[in-house]
Design a protein with these regions (language model features):
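N-terminal beta-strand motif that seeds the catalytic metal site of vicinal oxygen chelate
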Residues: 1-20, 71-76, 123-127
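Vicinal oxygen chelate
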Residues: 2, 89-127
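Core segments of cupin and vicinal oxygen chelate
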Residues: 10-53
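Short amphipathic alpha-helices in soluble, non-transmembrane regions
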Residues: 25-26, 87-91
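Exposed loop/turn and edge beta-strand positions of beta-sandwich/beta-sheet ligand-binding modules
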Residues: 40, 70, 103
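Short, charged/polar surface micro-motifs in flexible loops or helix N-caps
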Residues: 49-53, 60-62, 81-83
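Conserved beta-strand in the GNAT
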Residues: 54-56, 118
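Mid-chain, well-packed structural core segment of small domains
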Residues: 67, 74-88
Length: 127
């Protein structure tokens, strides 16, 4: 049976550069690529050497997604939850849904387009 791994997720945002800057600050990611999309629009890829988010935009991308559309949320693990929350707040976004549970802690935030993100930190380095 084949074994797989998530390589990337492509999401539509109104301002890829703004979203990329937040993800680079929040996660220590780098820009991997940017350019014209295959058919129309523009994309930037941010991530690490193994996986990434493709941040796509085009004239038809308006943002203001409803909860659960186009997806429920995207989750990331970090090694410094307080530092991550400060970065989110400094970007003018509002952290919410804080929870301390076994085995970790988390919070959520909506980006400028209404996309929900979860930020998690696990005790003992189990990420």
């Amino acid at each position: 049976m084949p074994k797989g791994k998530l390589e990337h997720v492509n999401i539509s945002v109104t301002a890829p550069e703004r979203s990329a800057a937040l993800l680079q600050d929040l996660l220590g990611w780098k820009e991997r690529w940017r350019g014209d999309s295959q058919k129309y629009g523009w994309t930037t890829h941010v991530g690490d050497d193994h996986d990434y988010l493709a941040l796509y935009t085009g004239d038809h991308v308006t943002g203001q997604y409803s909860k659960g559309a186009p997806l429920n949320h995207v989750a990331f693990t970090v090694d410094d939850l307080d530092g991550a929350e400060a970065i989110v707040a400094e970007a003018g976004l509002k952290p919410f849904g804080h929870d301390d549970y076994d085995p970790g802690k988390r919070f959520y935030f909506f980006d400028w387009d209404g996309i929900e993100f979860e930020v998690v930190s696990y005790a003992g380095g189990a990420q």
